[in-house]
Design a protein with these regions (language model features):
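P-loop NTPase motor domains
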Residues: 1-132, 147, 206, 211-235, ...
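H-loop/switch region of ABC-family ATPase nucleotide-binding domains
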Residues: 138
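Alpha-helix N-cap/helix-start and coil->helix boundary motif
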Residues: 72, 113, 141, 170-171
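P-loop NTPase motor core of the ASCE superfamily
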Residues: 60, 121-125, 143-246
Length: 246
């Protein structure tokens, strides 16, 4: 198989490396393949019922990758590899036949833990044109920065829609929402009373933040703020996922 030949060439190239480089390659490889020490992992990945072409065969197919909290770190190299393999095939297919139809929904819940994708910023900016709809879920902006460093802002900006749930306590996230929402001009009136009882009123304009950090933090559970493209920010009431009413 072509994949086997690629693996053999990579192995021969590794053997020819300087000893310290070879040691580094071995260490990285051990981390990546450690998940395959689990018999359950080997049996599932050897199952021929899943391949990227079969998943994208125009039928209503779904691939779930999930792991309990204590296994996420061990399995995330495997999960990342599976997602990147799928994306590579999806981009190749789109390059030949045009945007995927039906499109591929790539839903990355706990995107920083389950299957961190190295080039998430590029996928966020180019995926839509190839028929790939990307939904990334992070706990807060701080988590994005921890995983992706300087590319964190690019990743967030490349997602056209951004939704923020209630109860946010991360300062960076609150400041981001307030800064992007901006401010608006409001009419302000003030009344005063002189010592002899005379009253006066003054009118003027003032600028106020549209989404002050404290107001965003105090949003009730079940609500969210939506930023979409150049549209004004909107407040949403969320529907419980078990509620199937239309």
């Amino acid at each position: 198989k072509a994949a086997d030949e690629d693996a053999k060439r990579a192995w021969r190239a590794t053997l020819g490396r300087e000893e310290r480089q070879r040691s580094s390659v071995y260490t990285t490889t051990e981390v990546i393949v450690s998940a395959f020490a689990d018999e359950r992992v080997r049996s599932q990945t050897e199952d021929p019922s899943y391949t990227p072409p079969r998943l994208l065969d125009k039928r209503k197919n779904t691939l779930y990758l999930c792991a309990p909290l204590q296994e996420q770190e061990r399995l995330h190299p495997l999960f990342s590899m599976l997602v990147q393999e799928l994306l590579s095939y999806a981009y190749e297919k789109a390059a030949i036949k045009g945007a995927l139809d039906p499109p591929l929904l790539l839903l990355l819940d706990e995107a920083a833990n389950i299957a961190p994708i190295p080039d998430l910023d590029a996928i966020a900016s180019t995926g839509a044109g190839e028929g790939i709809q990307l939904l990334s879920v992070f706990q807060d902006m701080a988590q994005v920065g921890t995983v992706y460093g300087k590319r964190a802002a690019t990743i967030v900006n490349n997602h056209r829609a951004k939704m923020f749930g209630a109860g946010i306590s991360d300062r960076e996230t609150l400041e981001y929402i307030s800064r992007v929402a901006g401010s608006a001009e409001f009419e302000q009136r003030s009344r005063s009373r002189a010592e002899r009882g005379r009253r006066s009123m003054t009118e003027g304009d003032t600028y106020r933040d549209l989404a002050p950090a404290n107001v965003v933090r105090e949003h009730k559970p079940g609500s969210a703020l939506l930023m979409y493209g150049a549209l004004p920010m909107a407040k949403l009431d969320l529907r419980i996922h078990l509620d199937t009413r239309r």
